């Protein structure tokens, strides 16, 4: 009976299976400095759909929707909204515990958004590549709890897309800042 249960758990990641799910994240901070109290908050949702092209290798399409607000207390806050989309590939490496697998993901994203303070509004554009380690814990044969760190990434960001050709490029390494995302996935076996 144990063999049937463990082999059933690996069925979610076999060639021809699919997955639906996503991650979500929220951050909030408040700091006091020379110019007073500064507050910041953001929320993001990232739905994904994937297909296993071979055992333990998923490819799919992900979307990102985020909103945020920041600024000094007593002043008009800066509000941001953005949308991104792009393909990803994710590999699953199961441990001796058949309910637990380490994951490594490679993703590409293309996005746009806007930033506004009072009556002033700027359109933004971005493009990025990321490598993200994580793990999935299978709660049942169909549901997995997904945890991912924002790993190594390269992004190109244009903070004022509608006015000039000013581009900022940055290399980010986020493991030390521990920017985790948490989500659920539903696995559909073939």
What are these regions (language model features)?
Residues 18, 24-28, 43, 48-129, ...:
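Gram-negative (and chloroplast) outer-membrane scaffold detector with strong preference
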Residues 34-38:
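Short, polar loop/linker segments at the starts of domains and inter-domain junctions
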Residues 149-150:
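Internal, hydrophobic beta-strand segments that form the core of beta-sheet-rich folds
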Residues 1-16, 189-190:
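Cleavable N-terminal export/targeting peptides
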Residues 168-178:
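Individual transmembrane alpha-helices with interfacial aromatic-anchor signatures
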Residues 30-32, 115-118, 164-168:
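Extracytoplasmic loops and strand-loop junctions of Gram-negative outer membrane beta-barrel proteins
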């Amino acid at each position: 009976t144990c063999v049937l249960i463990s082999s059933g758990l690996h069925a979610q990641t076999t060639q021809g299976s699919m997955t639906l799910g996503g991650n979500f994240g929220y951050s909030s901070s408040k700091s006091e400095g020379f110019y007073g109290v500064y507050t910041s908050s953001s929320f993001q949702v990232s739905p994904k759909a994937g297909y296993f092209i071979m055992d333990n290798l998923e490819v799919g399409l992900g979307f990102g929707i985020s909103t945020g607000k920041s600024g000094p207390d007593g002043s008009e806050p800066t509000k941001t909204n953005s949308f991104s989309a792009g393909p990803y590939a994710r590999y699953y490496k199961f441990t001796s515990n058949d309910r637990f697998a380490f994951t490594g993901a490679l993703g590409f994203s293309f996005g746009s958004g806007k930033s506004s303070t009072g009556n002033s509004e700027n359109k933004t554009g971005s493009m990025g590549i990321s490598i993200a380690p994580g793990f999935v814990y299978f709660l049942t044969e169909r549901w997995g709890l997904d945890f991912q760190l924002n790993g190594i990434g390269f992004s190109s960001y244009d903070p004022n897309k509608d006015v000039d050709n000013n581009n900022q490029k940055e290399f980010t390494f986020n493991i030390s800042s521990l920017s985790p995302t948490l989500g659920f996935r539903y696995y559909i076996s073939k």
